[in-house]
Amino acid sequence: MFNIKFSFFSIISILFFLSGLTALVYQIIWMRQLSLFFGSDIYATTITLGTFMAGLSLGSYISGLIGDNLKKPILIYGILEIFIALSAALFPLIIFGMDETFRIVYQNYFFDQPLKYQLFRLLISIFTLLIPTIFMGATLPLLIRQFAIKKIELGEKVGFFYSINTFGALTGTILAGFILIQIAGITYSTIIMVITNIVVGIIAIIFSFNSFEKKDNFFPKQSQKRNILDEEKIHIFDPKYILFSTFFTGMAALALEVVWTRILVKSFSGTIHSFSIMLACFLFGIFYGSKKISKKLSNNHYPILILFKLQLWLAATVALLAPLTYLAPNIFGNLTWTLTSLMDGNFAIASILAQFIVASLLILIPTTLLGASFPAAVKSYINNFDFRARGTGYVYAFNTFGAVIGSLIGGFVLLPIFGTRISLIIIAALFFFSALILRKLIRRIENYDSIIKFHKFLPVIIFMASSIAISIMPDKTIMNYNMQKNSRPNVIYHSDGVSSTIDIVKSDEDNIIMMINGNIEADTGYVQRRQFVLIGHLPLLLHGEANDVAIVGLGLGITLKSLLNNPLVKNLKLIEISPEMIEAHQLNPEISGNALNNSKLEIVIDDARNYMKMSNQKFDVITVSPNHPRITGVGYLYTKEYYEILKDKLNTNGIVLQWIPLYQISKKSFDVAVKTFTEVYPNYSFWYVRGHGLFVGSLKPINLDFNDFAERYNQIPIKKDLLSIGIKTPEELLGHMLMDKANIISYLNSGEKIIINTDDNAYLEFHTPFEFLEKTESIVSELFPYVGWKLGSILKSYSNVEENKIKDSFDYRVNKLFSELKEKIQ
């Protein structure tokens, strides 16, 4: 009989592991798909995550209400898994079927009634996410109802199933972040998970009707002998206070995850793998903590004492680690380069290992305590063993609902008002508050003071010492390894904002440097200025007359100033996702002068892709200079679907200029980026500034009259701006064109078949983080044999003198392709 029961228990345990795995993969996929549907700004992300967590909370609560009355909880579990699969299969069909409806809502409400717009996004999230997440949240109480057959093993079973499901989620995080989506893409990953859920559901349903379960169902009746003395020891208080404590623990936990994510993203550079690593470490701690505590709870008469100690030590460890967060980028940088040298230059593996190590140092101890808290809370709460499903459901529901509130507080209150390190102290105080709620109850336990004496004072001392340390630390610190190592920059602006952390500093050479979440994104050094100024003027000079121009991204405002100073521009629309970036320029006029107050400028705070997709406006020129594709989320600004959106927003003679890096990217990934761009636009050319590719795409061929082009160039504001980056004549400007359409086609056809970067495969986002050490020389050397262009490809009229000057300028640029890469960059 033991073997039969063990076999049934093992099978359901494996199924529950798979439930956790699929749930996390779904969460990652759904958040990606919803970001494509209604934008990836912080409000969209928060709405999506909040709805997901709220569904889990509601599902657990409902399951708790009805679970104890179910005769076959495993049957219901199996049915729920199949419903989850069906919901996941329908998810993309539902959201992308609402495209036109959402476009109407956007156009009517985004600008004039933003609250209604956000409410509609919330309704979409509820409509698409709530049902499957309710089903997910309902599963744990059902398994506790089935398998917690003796009161003494309640804590053990809760801890076991909570840990096995969390371990599944951990596996799903690593699988989705490193393997599955990268290999199979979003669509096939969804199909694989749907099939997995269906198989899990069918197996659970089959076993719910067989002899194994019947024997298990009789087992509780034979074994459940109550020890009245034990129950009196365990429950000498009102258990509803456990729910309040659990709520605040969940609130603190998710706020902690939000703050840790910001800290580690700034330390690691926010690649898609960085987020997966952080989440994996978080989940591993919860898994390990719940697994380790489960055995100890079996014979413990006072689980509330364990819960009380856990909350105290959570407060202490979070506070203790807060001052150490400043060292995270330095530890990560040194560790990465040390491991790289030990691994014969394998930066990719070294970086991943270093991120895991640093994340574990900050996260693992507190999350282990968090993982142990849930089983302890469940056992502390349940008065009547006959209502074990209800107790489990209620505790899980309160904890998860607290997590919903915590995610909002962490992102919208703590970070923008207090910054990262002070936020950690406040979160530690929340854990202390959770412990104080419990202290009122445990005082009824005989000799409780002598039991917790050590645990009462030491955590408080640690908390106070850490708080003092944080209070005397500088509030403006640069979370960038190279900055910390090589210089002590003057901080012009620092903001831990709602959407991102913005740092603008002045270097030792008086260059202004802008960082977003720890990544250096722009500076006023000569090389960077050259590409930013060209991004502004080049498409306008090629177009001739641009009544409506759009610029994606503000950065340091160099391109923006060039566009505003260009007399060819009549109306300019800036689309910037980060309100903190706008604030930085408004508070520091030295960065971009008075550009943001220019009468020609209209500012839109939105995800650029979402705005272009939803707006009806068309443009003569669109300039796109996104971050490097290795930064998470930015890869969507390099996909075929995005280029098609931009193409649809061009007027008949419209031009798009897209920046594509030639540094920290492999030749293969560069080829993917170029091939993707050329798949969409019928006409294109490649312009080059050291390490930076400027790709010009248009609906119609560009046919310039050189005299008209030169006349536009010689307008004083344009000529002055271009002289500042060393371009003295219109011929020299044309010399920056490296390849025309014919030469680009020859280059792309010279090697193996090149894949297209799409929303589904996200090739660049998943591959470029591993290519940090790739050099520009490797790409330039492969491009070199195909460099060249015919003047007739963009010029319809020119003199022999002009032809010779253009060719001389081109030859000069080509001859410098390799030598300039050896010149020092500030």
Predicted regions and their residues:
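SAM/dcSAM-binding transferase cores
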Residues: 706-818
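Alpha-helical transmembrane segments of multi-pass membrane proteins
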Residues: 1-711, 768-775, 789-796
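Alpha-helical tetratricopeptide repeat
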Residues: 396-399, 811-825
